[in-house]
């Protein structure tokens, strides 16, 4: 979803997305070194992938729930965001073939993210889904959105990182 806009969107910055992982066991010979990505299906490191830092929480002692690594699962969570409202309305405008207003709504969200504005001619259903992924990562029940839009199967086939998932999902 960042292709063509890799450096031009603060939602993708190193401050917002963790892409580097380091060994943290101080007794290990690997301490402080980067964890190299694995490519095989049998290695558990296949499950280490970039994620948004907003779910990291504070890395502290595991016994202290107010500061421990818990993915912030103990904190309040967002139900609706203004950005989601703009993106829903952009989708409605798109379905009415009003690409100018769809682009305006998307650009409200992109402006806040300091991302390059989208042109009306570039607004497609895929673009709206990609923008939802960029903006609402970990906040949106993505599966429900894809089902609602009738796009679950084709998006899984196109983007799943696991071949078995891509090839076994059924219409």
Can you describe what each PLM-predicted range is?
Residues 1-81, 160-171:
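Elongated scaffold/linker segments in the mid-to-C-terminal portions of large proteins
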Residues 72-73, 105, 117-119:
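A generic helix-loop boundary/linker signal
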Residues 22-25, 41, 92, 135, ...:
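Sequence-pattern detector for short linear motifs
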